[in-house]
Amino acid sequence: MSLNNRWTVEQRYRRLEQIPQCDIEEMTLSRQQDKGFPSFHIAPKFGLLNDPNGLCYFNGEHHIFYQWTPVGPVHGMKYWYHLSTKDFIHFTDHGVGLHPDQDYDSHGVYSGGALVENNQVLLFFTGNKRDQNWNRIPTQCFATMDSDGSIEKHGVVIENEHYTEHFRDPKVWKKGDDYLMVVGAQTKTEHGSMALYQSKDLKTWQHKGPIKTKFSDLGYMWECPDFFEINGQSVMLFSPQGVSSSNPYDFKNIYSVAYIVGDQLNLESMTLENHQDILQPDYGFDFYAPQTYLDESGRRILIAWIGLPEIDTPSVTHQWAGMLSLPRELTLKDGFLVQTPLPELKSLRKEEVVFAQSHTLESTSCLIQLDLVGDGFELELSNLKGDNIVFSATEHEFMLDRRYMSHLYAEEFGGIRKAPRLDAKQTIDIYIDNSVIEIFINGGKHTMTSRFFIDDLNKVTLKGLEQARLFPLKGITGLFESAK
């Protein structure tokens, strides 16, 4: 059950300035006491974090915004919170970047993307407004961030004329002299789509229509769309809602993430030409709303929300929810998007420990590396009571089992996730950070990203492999040091 059902509308839509200081101090203290709070993942100081927004590389730094509801670990009044970093280890906390302070975003500054141009960051977001009857009025809006970090809004650039009230999450890029924008949209026939708009000046946008693929009946809404080119191919990345599958791997969460690779987008026919079947980048329990951007060296970097809409994790009892994934470089191989943790993260590693069979964890923030040669294995993380989460493999598939954690949640969606094993011989990276696990399998062609909750986690047990490598990991710095 979602906390949204236990809060009144008035409570969920309180603004930051309306939250008593004593409540902020109480939420902060509760979060600080949570042993499950991560040390090397971005998470909120209190309240709820969801979608990454406005990702870009600007003025020598990576800029990361994210959706933030400060009133509590619940979806309500949304702000854009702003961080920057040069190395993903040391961060600068800029505080709130975009506030819901206009009529068109009176009920939240919803998700969107960024484009760097002419020594400015162009920020595109959805203005969320509700009328007296609680009908949603979404618009696509525009702001700029200058080199000194100052942000100015420029109002609405696209009204909703063609879709239901589910019309949000703009992502903009430039191709030649044209600006192109994709927006997550629900058609009037209640199908999910990636709507495309075109502009010459960022002010007047022409509606080109939904991008056509053979998956036009996939779900009832596509959120957080992204469109980019990589290795000469075009990729549609999105988070569809209302999708299920009979096979043992795909679309097992309440909502999922998918991508489609094709040759090029034909702006005349509005089709993604020669596109392949739909694929999933992640087979874990908690992965949603990924967004990508290019850095100064041309790397395509992906960051996702480790969480899901309408699902509450046990951390809500400590007045926080949600975190961002580790940054992952994207490449394209054999038709798959390959995700690789950025090499900058190697700076987090402490001295390597090699263990066999079992090992007592001195730190529950660590990297475990496994070298597979073809056989099955089992890796168990546990406490003295036997509460556990188990990652294992057979000859043909991987499995993540969290049915026996200390604190269960989202049980109606099952406690096991599976992924196909594509190669007998491979190295697996497993990042563990107190209450989150990110597993890179099949050479990065798939990941398994999940939250887990084990009280006093202290042991890792290995079966089926002779040994594993473990690196304790340092924490990132600079979060929560903003004066704003």
Swiss-Prot record:
The keyword Hydrolase applies. Keywords: Carbohydrate metabolism, Cytoplasm, Glycosidase, Hydrolase. Substrate binds at residues 48-51, 67, 110-111, 168-169, 223. Induction: By sucrose. Gene3D superfamilies: Exo-inulinase, domain 1 (2.60.120.560), Glycosyl hydrolase domain, family 43 (2.115.10.20). It holds the Pfam family Glyco_hydro_32N. Its EC number is 3.2.1.26. This is Sucrose-6-phosphate hydrolase. It comes from Vibrio alginolyticus. The lineage of its organism: Bacteria, Pseudomonadati, Pseudomonadota, Gammaproteobacteria, Vibrionales. The gene is scrB.
